[in-house]
Regions:
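Short glycine-rich substrate-engagement loop in P-loop NTPases that contacts/grips substrate
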Residues: 54-86
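Structural recognition of the conserved hydrophobic beta-strand(s) that form the central parallel beta-sheet
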Residues: 116-122, 143
Length: 358
């Protein structure tokens, strides 16, 4: 099992008796369902998991659940034998964005206090913005990302003691000896190849086959792009264009999004694509950075709304697109290849995973 640091946050929240329902947001395929299921089954004898996206394309039981009693009736129809007491029953509402009205209902489920709840989903920023009544004060929203470099080290067998020693060195601004530095650089290069998507990391650990890793990365990349298909034809094409252009934008001279290049239309501005940018960012499949005019604090006051840079949410997907199976480009430090965009993406991913605003 992959060690995820968010597991401690989930466990602490569920043990705390907090009055708020924990809502885990994040891109698909980053491990939300798996880690919630793992912690939930560990802490609660009765664990009820309901995938609302699956329900929305199947029985549609929860489509018209408008009240707390409606909700409980439907839960009892499929998992009634697991409905115990609040302290021993956790109801996990997965893919909650499939039924936006359930986001509003979280407040009433919390007030009813019959069971313990946790929820997860993607595109929750967009969904909450479109929800008629946002349950402010009733939920605690936390975003989850692919594995960061530290989690990748854990996955590859580095223990808590070694990680703590490295952190102490870093905080003291002390250098590593040559052997340890070489080992860490080797691990970092492998992280650039594999990235942090759990399926790709597991494939690497199980097979050490970069072809298998690349196949998974390509599938997830295509899945992210195709996920925009729920929108009308014009908008989904714009989203796909912007998403597909992220790697090439990082490689061009300006290294940022140029509105006129998205569709090749002169006079296009960022205002023409606000909804499309919002989709990619809210879905968690793109990380956004705004340029600043002057490097003075607070930075947000000098940020330029029309100067935007987008990164892919996973460095492994980027290296898959740019280099395919040419692992020597990264492992051998070929001077003829500029890895600037790869390092930028890795740093952006690391910063945002640790709670820093880009």
């Amino acid at each position: 099992m992959l060690k995820r640091k968010i597991a401690d946050l989930i466990e602490q929240h569920l043990k705390s008796g907090s009055g708020r329902i924990l809502l885990i947001d994040g891109a698909r395929q980053v491990g939300k369902t798996y880690i919630i299921r793992h912690v939930g089954k560990k802490l609660f004898p009765n664990f009820i998991e309901i995938n609302m996206l699956e329900d929305s394309v199947g029985a549609r039981l929860f489509e018209n659940a408008k009240t707390v009693d409606d909700f409980y009736l439907r839960v009892s129809a499929i998992k009634g034998e697991l409905m115990g007491k609040a302290e021993d029953t956790l109801i996990f509402i997965d893919e909650i964005q499939a039924y936006p009205h359930l986001l509003t209902m979280l407040k009433f489920l919390r007030d009813d206090n019959r069971f313990t709840y946790i929820a997860s989903g993607s595109l929750l920023g967009v969904t909450l913005a479109q929800t008629t009544s946002i349950p402010i004060g009733s939920i605690r929203k936390v975003r989850m990302f692919p594995l960061d470099f530290e989690e990748f080290l854990y996955a590859n067998g580095m223990n808590e003691f070694a990680i703590a020693a490295l952190r102490k060195k870093f905080e003291a601004r002390e250098s590593l000896d040559e052997a340890m530095h070489g080992k860490m650089m080797d691990s970092f290069k492998r992280y650039l190849l594999v990235g942090g998507l759990p399926a790709a990391v597991n494939a690497y650990l199980d097979t050490r086959n970069i072809q298998a890793v690349r196949e998974i990365q390509r599938e997830i990349h295509d899945y992210y792009a195709a996920d925009a298909s729920k929108y009308d034809a014009e908008r989904k094409l714009k989203i796909r264009r912007i998403y597909d252009q992220i790697p090439s934008n990082l490689e061009n001279k300006k290294k940022r999004v140029v509105a006129q290049r998205i569709e090749g239309k002169k006079g296009s501005t960022f205002a023409n694509y606000e909804d499309e940018f919002e989709y990619l960012i809210s879905a968690g499949i793109a990380l956004n950075v705004q340029a600043i005019s002057t490097p003075t604090f607070p930075l947000i006051e000098s940020s330029g709304k029309n100067l935007l840079k987008l990164y892919l949410n996973d460095v492994g997907i980027l290296t898959s697109i740019l280099y395919g199976s040419n692992i020597r480009a990264i492992l051998d430090n070929q001077r003829s290849i500029n890895l600037g965009s790869v390092y930028e993406t890795a740093v952006a991913s690391e910063l945002i995973a640790h709670g820093h605003k880009l």
